């Protein structure tokens, strides 16, 4: 799959330190992206949450999962037991993908990259939607589900027009928060940001990437859904809810 980076993205990159945090260059803010369900309870949209200003360049982001200053590093990685070793492949993600086809689309699925955001489950699942896409009736839903797959596990090729469908993202980094199952998810890296390994080599540059921040992934630096099984919670959602509640109480007092 063709790289989604360009010369304008050169100032943005992430350096993985060997036993420590992610060093993030060129990013001014880290935003929460909160998974919100549709009427059937399936993941459907992201809602913007709290914004965290990066005070330095580079900014160190926690990847061990133990910082008390999340999303930022506070040095906890040197005081706790965790395995920082990178084990993920640097191959093209298409190489390890399964394939589902229809006349219009080919869906590539690299399951190793799954971050369990579950946008692919709505309306019977994106695999079924692709296979049974008569008269292109499902095109909009298929593209929506692909665009909201944060890890890039799912990649959609348009057979008739000869291109991979990708949403347009500016370079940015977000914190995924799952309001449905009350779990904190990975770092969502968007817009073709280069990710440099601790050994100095680069991972494949992609438009949609999720990086582990719970410290438990067995496919580091990428998320492998381990935050689900470890019940990872950064407690930032709770802080945001308490802030909103306080603001509402203040407004009530003003108007009384």
Per-region residue spans from a language model:
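Intrinsically disordered, low-complexity linkers and tails
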Residues: 1-40, 50-56, 93-95, 103-104, ...
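Ferredoxin-like iron-sulfur electron-transfer modules
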Residues: 47-63, 95-116, 126-147, 159-165, ...
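Iron-sulfur cluster-binding cysteine motifs and their immediate structural context
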Residues: 70-81, 115-133, 144-161, 220-231
């Amino acid at each position: 799959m063709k790289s989604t980076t360009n010369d304008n993205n050169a100032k943005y990159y992430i350096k993985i330190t060997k036993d420590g945090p992610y060093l993030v260059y060129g990013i001014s803010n880290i935003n929460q992206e909160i998974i919100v369900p549709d009427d059937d309870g399936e993941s459907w949209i992201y809602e913007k949450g709290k914004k965290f200003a990066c005070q330095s360049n580079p900014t160190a982001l926690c990847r061990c999962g133990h910082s008390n200053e999340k999303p930022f590093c506070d040095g906890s990685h040197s005081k706790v037991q965790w395995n920082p070793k990178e084990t993920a492949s640097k191959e093209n993600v298409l190489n390890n993908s399964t394939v589902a086809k229809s006349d219009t689309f080919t869906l590539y699925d690299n399951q190793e990259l799954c971050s369990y955001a579950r946008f692919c489950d709505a309306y019977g699942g994106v695999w079924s939607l692709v296979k049974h896409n008569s008269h292109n009736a499902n095109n909009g839903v298929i593209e929506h589900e692909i665009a909201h797959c944060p890890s890039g596990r799912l990649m959609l090729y348009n057979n008739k027009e000869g291109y991979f469908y990708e949403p347009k993202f500016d370079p940015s980094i977000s914190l995924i928060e799952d309001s449905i199952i009350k779990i904190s998810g990975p770092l969502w890296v968007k817009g073709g940001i280069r990710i440099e390994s601790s050994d100095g080599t680069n991972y494949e540059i992609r438009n949609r990437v999720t990086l582990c921040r719970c410290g438990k992934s067995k496919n580091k630096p990428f998320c492998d859904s381990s935050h689900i099984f470890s019940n990872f919670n950064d407690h930032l959602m709770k802080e945001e809810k308490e802030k909103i509640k306080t603001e509402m109480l203040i407004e009530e007092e003003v108007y009384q």
